[in-house]
Amino acid sequence: MTVSLIISTYNWPRALYLCLDSVMQQTAMPTEILIADDGSGISTRDVVRHFEAVSPVPIRHIWHEDKGFRLAMIRNKAIAASRCEYIIQIDGDLILQRH
């Protein structure tokens, strides 16, 4: 079974950092992590790059230009980019309980 974890985010790099840090603490990891970014700036990109370097699973940054609130569109792009059988979607301001 393969699983994509899709994390939606927009211009809150500190929250995304904490969210990804909680993902890294899990004992059961997804096959891949997709960051569905609704047009965030460089600080968010830097957080994603940091975790790309330390993650035991691939992380891909799915981004589009900020043209207003287009969360559904960026989530759909991330779903289309998934390479897995199953998808779990969470928001980038969640901290996962350790499992």
PLM regions: where:
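Cell-envelope/extracellular polymer assembly enzymes that use nucleotide-activated donors
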Residues: 2-4, 32
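Short beta-strand/turn micro-motifs composed of small residues
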Residues: 7-9, 37
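Acidic donor-binding segment of Leloir-type glycosyltransferases
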Residues: 24-63
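Acidic donor-binding/catalytic loop of UDP-sugar-dependent glycosyltransferases
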Residues: 43, 94-99
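Glycine-rich, basic loop-to-helix element that forms the pyrophosphate-binding segment
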Residues: 65-82
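Short aromatic/hydrophobic "clamp" motif used to bind/position activated sugar donors
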Residues: 87
